UniProtKB/Swiss-Prot annotation:
Binding site residues for ATP: T30, L31, G32, P33, K51, D87, G88, T89, T90, T91, G415, D496
Subunit description: Forms a cylinder of 14 subunits composed of two heptameric rings stacked back-to-back. Interacts with the co-chaperonin GroES.
Organism ancestry: Bacteria, Pseudomonadati, Chlorobiota, Chlorobiia, Chlorobiales
GO BP annotation list: protein refolding
Protein known as: Chaperonin GroEL
Gene name linked to the record: groEL
Length: 550
C-alpha cells in the first residue's frame, strides 16, 4: 500500500474549500441568460464551447489532491442533479458553494459542525415543502415551450420544437435528439408502434417506389416460435384468405417451405401478406410481443400458454388501421386493442421503471412505454460546424430533461425567485439549539445566492440591491436578467421545473453538510519524478571497443 498524506480539522477544510471554490467559480459563470461560455481544451479535435454546468464540472481535475477532493465532492452535486432532474446543475453548484462557505465561517467561530448540519437538513426539508406549495402544474403547450426555452439558454426555437414533440407523442412518448446531416434543425415524428425489424423477403413489397409493404386494416398473427412447416400455418391462412383482409405475421422467424409458400401466395394475389421477425431477444422479446398483442387486441400464440399455431382462429389475431413495413422497420398505426388493457399495460411498465435499478433496463422500458403511448419523436440538430452542433445538442438534451421534470412536478417562478419565496418555510423550523438555528440561517442566506449570481453575470447591476428589491416583492415578482427589468416572472415566461429546483437544493445541502462535518482528509502521497530509477545510457553496453573494427 502506498504512503498516505493526512490533513486535519481547519487545515483539511481550508484545502477542500479551495477545491470547491475553483470548480464552483468555473461553473457559475454559465448561470442565467447572461451566463458566459466556458471553453474546454480536448486532447483530440477542436476545443468544446459549453454553457452547461455539468459539462464544465466533469472536466475539472486539480493537481493538488486535497483540493481535488473538494472539487470532486461538488462535481458529485452537479452530476447527481443532472442524473435525477436533467438540469439545474449550475444552481446546485452555486448553492453547495454558498452553504459550505457560510458553514465554514461558523465552524471557525466555534459552532458544532454536526448541529450546523442538522439545522441545514431541517431547513432544506421545510424549504422543499414550501416549493411544493407554490408549484403550479404544467399543462399547456405554451408553458412547456417556456420551460424548454429557458433551459436551452433562452433559445425559443428549441423550446418550440420540444413543445411540438411533446404535443405529438405525449408526455410519456420517447423524444430522441440526433445530429442532422444538414444545417436545419427539425422535428420528425413516427406515429404508432415502431420496431426495428424489416420484411423477410422483398417480394412482400406492395409499393415499389417506396420499397415498402403497406397493409390496410390487416389481421396480425403474433407467434413466439420459428415457423418452418407450412401445415402449421395453413389453417389460419385459409381463414384469413376467406375474410379478404391482409395478414401481417410477426414470429421468431419464418423459413423454408413456410416462407416460400407465403411469397408464392403473395405473388399470385391469393393473399396479401407480409412477415417479419419478432423484435428484441429473450425475455425482452416475449414482453414486446405481449405489448404488440395488447395494442392490437390479439393473443400471443405461445405453447407456454397452451396455444398451438395449427389450432389458431381469427379471434387470436390482432388488428390495426395500417401496418407499414420497409427493409429495416415495422410500424403499426392505430392498434385496435382495448383502451383499458393498454392503460393497464402502460401502468405495469411504469411500475417496472420505478423499480428498475439498471439504466439500460430503464431506457428499454421507457422505449416500450412510448411505443404503447403513441409514438417516437426525433429532433434532428443542424449546425454550421461540429463544435456548434455539439453545443446545441447538449442544450436541446438539457431542455428536454427540464420539460420532462416540469411535467412530473410542475413549475415555479424562475430566475432564483422561487428559492427566495420558499425561504418563508424556514419560519416553521424548530431548532433545538443555537448552532442548529445558525444552520437554518446559513440556508436562508444560500437561497439568495442563485439570484445574486444571475445578476452578477449580467455585469451591470448590484446583486445585493436586486435581492433586497425581490425580497420586498410577492409571488412571482422578480428580476428578469435577460431584459434587466423587474416583472412577474411567470408572465414573462421565466419559469423553472419544481423538480429541478428541489433536486438542486437537496443535493447541494447533502454534499455541503458532508464537507462541513469532515475532520480529516486522506490522500496518496504523490511520488516525485526524481525517485524514478535512472535510464541506462544509450547504445549497447560493453561494445564500445568495437569502434576499432572499422
Amino acid at each position: 500500500m502506498s504512503a498516505k498524506d493526512i490533513l486535519f480539522d481547519a487545515s483539511a477544510r481550508a484545502k477542500l474549500k479551495v477545491g470547491v471554490d475553483k470548480l464552483a467559480d468555473a461553473v457559475k459563470v454559465t448561470l442565467g441568460p447572461a451566463g458566459r461560455n466556458v471553453l474546454i481544451d480536448k486532447k483530440f479535435g477542436a476545443p468544446t464551447s459549453t454553457k452547461d454546468g455539468v459539462t464544465v464540472a466533469k472536466e475539472i481535475e486539480l493537481e493538488d489532491s486535497f483540493e481535488n477532493m473538494g472539487a470532486q465532492m461538488v462535481r458529485e452535486v452537479s452530476s447527481k442533479t443532472s442524473d435525477v432532474a436533467g438540469d439545474g446543475t449550475t444552481t446546485a453548484t452555486v448553492l453547495a458553494q454558498a452553504i459550505y462557505r457560510e458553514g465554514l465561517k461558523n465552524v471557525a467561530a466555534g459552532a458544532r459542525p454536526i448541529d450546523l448540519k442538522r439545522g441545514i437538513d431541517k431547513a432544506v426539508k421545510e424549504v422543499i415543502g414550501e416549493l411544493r406549495t407554490i408549484s403550479n402544474d404544467i399543462s399547456g403547450k405554451i408553458e412547456i415551450a417556456q420551460v424548454g426555452t429557458i433551459s436551452a439558454n433562452n433559445d425559443p426555437e428549441i423550446g418550440q420544437l420540444i413543445a411540438d414533440a411533446m404535443e405529438k407523442v405525449g408526455k410519456d412518448g420517447v423524444i430522441t435528439v440526433e445530429e442532422a446531416k444538414g444545417m436545419d434543425t427539425e422535428l420528425k415524428v413516427v406515429e404508432g408502434m415502431q420496431f426495428d425489424r424489416g420484411y423477410l423477403s422483398p417480394y412482400f413489397v406492395t409499393n415499389s417506389e417506396k420499397m415498402d409493404a403497406e397493409l390496410e386494416d390487416p389481421y396480425i398473427l403474433i407467434h413466439d416460435k420459428k415457423i418452418s412447416n407450412m401445415k402449421d400455418l395453413l389453417p389460419i391462412l385459409e381463414k384469413t384468405a376467406q375474410s379478404g383482409r391482409p395478414l401481417m405475421i410477426i414470429s421468431e422467424d419464418i423459413e423454408g417451405e413456410a416462407l416460400a409458400t407465403l411469397v408464392v401466395n403473395k405473388l399470385r394475389g391469393t393473399l396479401k401478406v407480409c412477415a417479419v421477425k419478432a423484435p428484441g431477444f429473450g425475455d425482452r422479446r416475449k414482453a414486446m410481443l405481449e405489448d404488440i398483442a395488447i395494442l392490437t387486441g390479439g393473443t400471443v400464440i405461445s405453447e407456454e400458454k397452451g396455444y398451438k399455431l395449427e389450432n389458431a382462429t381469427i379471434s387470436y389475431l390482432g388488428q390495426a388501421a395500417t401496418v407499414t413495413v420497409d427493409k429495416d422497420n415495422t410500424t403499426i398505426v392505430e392498434g385496435k386493442g382495448q383502451a383499458d388493457d393498454i392503460k393497464a399495460r402502460i401502468n405495469e411498465i411504469k411500475n417496472q421503471i420505478d423499480a428498475s435499478t439498471s439504466d439500460y433496463d430503464t431506457e428499454k422500458l421507457q422505449e416500450r412505454l412510448a411505443k404503447l403511448s403513441g409514438g417516437v419523436a426525433v429532433i434532428n440538430i443542424g449546425a454550421s460546424t461540429e463544435v456548434e452542433m455539439k453545443e446545441k445538442k447538449a442544450r436541446v438534451e438539457d431542455a428536454l430533461h427540464a420539460t420532462r421534470a416540469a411535467v412530473q412536478e410542475g413549475i415555479v417562478a424562475g430566475g432564483g425567485v422561487a428559492l427566495i419565496r420558499a425561504a418563508k418555510g424556514l419560519d416553521n423550523v424548530q431548532p433545538e439549539n443555537e448552532d442548529q438555528k445558525t444552520g437554518v440561517e446559513i440556508v436562508r442566506r444560500a437561497l439568495e445566492e442563485p439570484l445574486r449570481q444571475i445578476v452578477a453575470n449580467t455585469g451591470t447591476t448590484d446583486g445585493a440591491v436586486v435581492v433586497e428589491r425581490v425580497k420586498q416583492g410577492e409571488g412571482d415578482f422578480g428580476f428578469n436578467a435577460r431584459t434587466e427589468e423587474y416583472e412577474k416572472m411567470t408572465e414573462a415566461g421565466v419559469v423553472d421545473p419544481t423538480k429541478v429546483t428541489r433536486t438542486a437544493l437537496e443535493n447541494a445541502a447533502s454534499v455541503a453538510g458532508i464537507l462541513l462535518t469532515t475532520e480529516a482528509a486522506i490522500t496518496d502521497i504523490k511520488e516525485e519524478g526524481g525517485d524514478m530509477p535512472a535510464m541506462p545510457p544509450g547504445g549497447m553496453g560493453g561494445m564500445g571497443g568495437m569502434g576499432g573494427m572499422m
